[in-house]
Amino acid sequence: MSDSFFKDIPEFLETRVNESLDARSKSIAQFKELGPPDQVNTIKVNAKNPSKEVGTYHFVSGVDASSSASLAAYLNTLSYSLDKSQQWFGKGNAWRVSHGVYCCYNVFSQVDVRVEAKIPGGVDTYAIDENGQKHIVDARMWTEAYMSEVLRSLLYSDDTNSRFAGHRRFNPIPNPDAELRFFEAAEQLFTLGYTLGSSSEVRVPTHVNNHLVRGIFAYLKQTCRYSAALNLFEKLRVSIPEVSVLLAELYLLMDHEVHAVRILHDSLLKQRMSASLLIVQVKFLISKERYDLALICAKRAVHASPSEFATWACLADVYLHLEDFKSALLALNSCPMYTYYERDAYPLPPSARAHLPFPVNFPKEELEVENNAQNGYTVSTEITDPYLARLPSPSLRGTFAKAYEMLTLICAKIGWDELLRVRSAVFVMEEEYRSLNDITEGNASPDQNEVAEESVAEEVVGLDKPETSVGSLPKNATVQSKRLCERWLDNLFMVLYEDLRVFTIWRAEYTHFKSQGLAYRKAPAEWEILGEVAFRLHHRVEAVEAFCACLESMFSFKAWKTLLIIYSEDNNIELVLTAIAKLTLYNYRWYQEYSPFLLEQMKNRIMQDGALKMKSILASTRLDPYILNLIHKLYFEWAIAFQIPGHEL
């Protein structure tokens, strides 16, 4: 059966032919976001026994979905891969692809566009809706399918929540011709952008705040090719005045601050209560350290859109820069929290067998303990402290993750003890509540369910556990100057306490062992968790220490990615390139040729240091020639195609 698999393409063997296709069809009505990745199903028959057929499937992103011809071409390439596989095993053509189906979800029309190819034979194209009905695919629907595919690639390729095995990822915009097609499609579909939804931090999607706009700016940050977007926004601004805010953001990205300020000024004269314009203005003023003016604009933004998370978070950020931590906590407490929706997925029947081959000539030795580091998550064979594994902070998503990040910034600035003091100064604590209850006659004691959850924990190196705030007050309460702390913020204080507790114990143990002249040892997975904790708490030196200790014993995608962020901020080009090389190789092993994060990092280095210097440094690192060729193919050739400044070799 091994000779029926493709040589270098991941596959899952179906127990029953097309069962995964049926599962996708039944789940179309459940897709709420941009949709799942494209699914490719193939049926293979045995030349010696034509009645014997097997069904396989895999997932793919970044394929040109602008026409049936381009998708049929992808299906056709699979036949060549099967031929190579059989030649590789030194066998005749025992198996051949007889049938292939390419599925691409069109998020605009909410249908699954499918190209069905018989090999040899014709190509059939149709769309399936949530009721299983077939529809004709017209030119408009192809444009929508193309844009849906590109947006999924731009926005989800680096999302660890949507990564799973058997998923090939290609660059959706590999050359200037593809870029032109992208912006032409964006112009046609711009007015429908709000129907796609937006990030988890936005309550109501608008023309200027949606997944389509997010995708455009994600692409611009990768390439810095602003001219096409500039023309697009100038054209759209005539009929959609709100687009002015996108134009201002674009000019700020281009470092054309005078143009940006002029647009903001003119637009705010016409749209005085535009929260989007005011937020851009606030961020600009913060960058210029004019926090007094930023505060005025942030307050206006809150008045303009009090139900949006972004406006309150913006106000809290300004207070943080002003070091008015009481007001920052109050603004944070006022942030509306939204439910986080996971990326679209659907239940698949268990596969009979999985085929996840290494790329040809892949240097396996470069990824130490590779089997313990699949799909971005490391699993150590050593026993990990169960308390570390149960930390709640890694599970935070959306607005809760953003609010927690702001809370950690406040804590990093003033310390845990001062944070507790500020908290008790602005919020009513449980002790005060009980005192009020004792004074107020006829009031029943508060229900224990109304008090934030609290567990008894050991006292840790002088780290005080946060006192619980209350969820309601007696009607005749006399504490007029304090607010009620929202339950979610109360919980975030407990989450922060857990992180601080782990960090404090770790550093205390480390100091003790060092003073005794003893080696401090942890399991690799424990080092990885400790590094994440330190990074969340903005202790960069300790984070680097933990991640490096982790990498001494095992490969960790998380560790290398976080180290890349830190090394980039420190402008350490040698370590940046080493991290990029490791992450690129790991991604390539799992069929990912496109990473917006790595592409942007590489673009920044090319623009700053030049491709020639980077190639010289890479050559001196003694990396395997396979990795050097891979970096040249994925990054340097891309930079040449797009004429990125500094691309000359």
Swiss-Prot record:
Q: Name one Pfam family in it.
A: ChAPs
A GO cellular component annotation in the UniProt record: cell division site
Task: Name where it mostly resides.
Answer: nucleus
Q: Does the keyword Transcription apply?
A: no
**Coiled coil ranges:** none
Gene Ontology terms: biological process: Golgi to plasma membrane protein transport; Golgi to plasma membrane transport; Golgi to vacuole transport; intracellular calcium ion homeostasis
Record key words, sorted? Cytoplasm, Nucleus
Give the superkingdom in one word: Eukaryota
Entry's localization field: Nucleus; Cytoplasm
Name of this chain's protein: Uncharacterized protein C31F10.16
What is the originating organism of this protein?
Schizosaccharomyces pombe (strain 972 / ATCC 24843)
